Amino acid sequence: CGESGLFITKKRYAILVYDDEGTRRDIDGKPGKVKAMGLDLKRSDTPVFMQDFLSEVLLKVLQKGTEDEILDSITEFRTDFKSRPGHEKGSPKRANKIGHYQRLEQKQGKANMPGHVRASINWNTLKRMNSDKYSQEIVDGMKVIVCKLKQNPMGYTSVAYPVDELHLPEWFKDLPFDGDAMEETIIDNKLGNLIGPLNYDLQSTKQKNTFNNLFDFGGSE
């Protein structure tokens, strides 16, 4: 039996279940079990910390949390997100056909390719330009994080880095990461897909955040 539900379309919904075919799920202080269909809570292109937050927001909605409570938690999450280092705001991808596109570009100059491939090749190029012999080269099949960049002398719009790279080089950390663009991809789009149909004032969580940042005199620059 379900206690409450969020129904977006016929094949996209979530229910808070307290009786799962005779097994009680609302015991030991737990609210029940969330059954979700088609909501992309665990998409591989979503960072784990965002997956966890989406699940948290969904549970609040299913537990009949008020709009203000949910918007406050989103505002707080935005603040935490902004304080993260730029490279932690990227999107996970799997690098495919890197070798193929690198060879293609060597033959014919600039070639069209998927964004995550371009970002991976940009990492390899910057690694060479910085005479970095220690960081891993991105090759086919590697898991990478793709980060968006602000305007820069190289004209790059994004750069990837290997998930397994334990010591990110300083030349990489110093790149001009575009936190606002990544916030839109990671937070705005994902929340819009999940709770957009509820017509909550998600825009207000941005305005509140900007206001708080402007008047947070105790914070560091």
What are these regions (language model features)?
Residues 1-221:
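DNA-dependent DNA polymerase catalytic subunits
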